[in-house]
Design a protein with these regions (language model features):
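Extracytoplasmic
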Residues: 11-45
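Interfacial helix-cap and linker-helix signal at transmembrane-aqueous boundaries
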Residues: 36-37, 73-74, 158-164
């Protein structure tokens, strides 16, 4: 382990900020669900109530499916390439609900978001274990958990504010990933 690399502020910030993405994946859009349900019900989409609920839960299903795949990708291509690709996919797939009008396509975007979260979670955690050992690792994982909790509160609150504008708006929060 290269001590100067593990003490790098940019490395620490990258790992902490990308860790906030995992928690915000599902809950950020929760405040927009009533507006989505109303919109798609008025359009006559069959089973709109059920499908809109799946918009919230789909990422979790695909995180479960994608996590072992992410581990295989890490072994083959490395941690940083997977993290970079996953963050990009996260921003694109997560924000898809801001411009898509098809509930089915939004569900596809949410599935892709789940795969992206799996990649972010797996690569960030693996990088933490690569760069930190002993007490430094334990402390950093504690800091990571704090960032995840803070991110969840911040992004859920922001999602609620944006949902007051329209149901598409909270999906824009996912573009934060591209800036991190």
């Amino acid at each position: 382990m290269n001590i100067s690399r593990s003490n790098s502020l940019s490395l620490k910030l990258t790992l902490l900020l990308t860790s906030t993405l995992t928690v915000m994946a599902g809950a950020t859009i929760a405040p927009s669900l009533p507006g989505m349900e109303k919109h798609f019900s008025e359009l006559g989409v069959a089973n709109a109530e059920l499908l809109v609920r799946l918009v919230l839960t789909f990422p979790a299903l695909f995180i479960v499916i994608g996590s072992p795949i992410a581990g295989i990708i890490i072994d083959k291509f490395g941690r940083k390439p997977l993290l970079a690709a996953s963050v990009l996919l996260y921003g694109l797939a997560g924000s898809s609900g801001s411009y898509l009008e098809s509930l089915e396509l939004i569900l596809v975007g949410r599935a892709l978001l789940g795969f992206a979260v799996a990649g972010v979670m797996t690569s960030a955690t693996t990088l933490i274990t690569d760069y930190f050992t002993g007490q430094a690792r334990a402390s950093f994982i504690g800091l990571q958990a704090a960032f995840m909790g803070f991110g969840g509160v911040l992004f859920l609150s922001l999602g609620g504010r944006l949902a007051d504008l329209n149901w598409h708006a909270p999906f824009l929060i996912y573009l934060f990933a591209v800036s991190s």
